[in-house]
Amino acid sequence: METIVLGVAPREIKKNAAGKLRKTGEVPAVVYHKGEATIAVSVNEIALNKLVHSAESHIIDLKFPDGNVKRSFIKDVQFDPVTDRVIHTDFQLVSANEVIEMDVPVAVEGDAIGVEKGGKLQIIRHSLTVKGKPGDMPAHVTIDVTALEIGHSIHVREIPATAFPGLEIMDDRDTPVVTVLASKKEAEATEAVAGATPEGAA
C-alpha cells in the first residue's frame, strides 16, 4: 500500500466556521487516536478528493505547517446529500504495530464466463473492512471472477484467506461481493419460457 503525504492545518471551531472554510476550497476534518485529544484541522478539497475517490486505499502522512507529521488513514467521510461534495473527514492516527480496521476497495480481475455469455458483471460491495497491521494492508482486495457464471455470486467466504496473510476480512461471510446478472433480453426470454403453457395442457 502506498503512503501519501497530505498537508493539513489546524482550525478553530466556531459557529459557521465550517461553512466559510468550505467556500475557500478547504474541507473541515478531525484527527484522532484512542487516548489522545482530537485535533481539528482543514485539508485542501482537491487533494482530499483524489484520495477519497481513489480505486486504492492509502496510509496518509498528515503534514502540519510546523513540519510535524502524523501517520493516519481515512476512517470516515461525510458527503453533501445534494452535491455529493466531501464536507467532513475523520483521520485516525496509527502506529506501525497497531491492529486497525480499514475499508479497502474491491477490484476484479479476469473475464467472467457469464459476461462472455451475455451477462453483466456487477460489483455489489465496492469496499470491504479489513483488519490487520498498516504495513500488511493491501491497496485493494482483488477478486478473480473468471469462473463466475450468470446468476452466480462470489461471497466473502469464497475470497481465499491465503491471498491476504496476516489479515482478516471483517464483513459477514455470507455477504455477496460480486455477481453476474442476466441481460435484460435474456431475463425476458427466461420469463417467457417459464410462463408458457406446456403443449397439450388444458
UniProtKB/Swiss-Prot annotation:
Keywords: Ribonucleoprotein, Ribosomal protein, RNA-binding, rRNA-binding
SUPFAM superfamilies recorded: Ribosomal protein L25-like
One BP term from GO: translation
InterPro entries recorded: Rbsml_bL25/Gln-tRNA_synth_N, Ribosomal_bL25/Gln-tRNA_synth, Ribosomal_bL25_b-dom, Ribosomal_bL25_C, Ribosomal_bL25_long, Ribosomal_L25_dom, Ribosomal_uL5_bac-type
Pfam families: Ribosomal_L25p (PF01386), Ribosomal_TL5_C (PF14693)
Molecular function terms from GO: 5S rRNA binding; structural constituent of ribosome
A GO cellular component entry from the record: cytosolic large ribosomal subunit
Gene3D superfamilies (alphabetical): Ribosomal protein L25, beta domain (2.170.120.20), Ribosomal Protein L25, Chain P (2.40.240.10)
Physiological role: This is one of the proteins that binds to the 5S RNA in the ribosome where it forms part of the central protuberance.
UniProt similarity note: Belongs to the bacterial ribosomal protein bL25 family. CTC subfamily.
HAMAP family in alphabetical order: Ribosomal_bL25_CTC
Subunit and partners: Part of the 50S ribosomal subunit; part of the 5S rRNA/L5/L18/L25 subcomplex. Contacts the 5S rRNA. Binds to the 5S rRNA independently of L5 and L18.
Name listed for the protein in its UniProt record: Large ribosomal subunit protein bL25
Organism this protein belongs to: Chlorobium luteolum (strain DSM 273 / BCRC 81028 / 2530) (Pelodictyon luteolum)
